[in-house]
């Protein structure tokens, strides 16, 4: 059994209900949102409308919708930022690095000059904060670990609008 992170209320459900300005794109089964932690400028997450925690919990229709949404935002990120690459990833359970108990699929434009290394940029922050990889998430370390990637609401809104304007028709 995979151990799940606990957050109540669910921050991704709150985005869907109360912070609609963070939504870049939407479909029947998904929302694409700007990640509040900009490890790379333009980092987005595709989330399910239905509150489920794991890839293992998704329906086949939701799985297909997630990849379609990820491709749409990846195309918009490519147009908007001309990145060197686009990283996609998803974590299942706290021991894989999942911090929010709501399915989300990261879509990250990798920029020239990035010093996060290869792979998910969040993992690089674990080492610098003294958190060994593969350990349970402790929200108490978020402030130190995420200090470098915090963006203001204005910056997030502007970035979201730039990406939104480049979504495929």
Q: What are the language-model segments listed below?
A:
Residues 1-169:
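HIT superfamily nucleotide-processing domains
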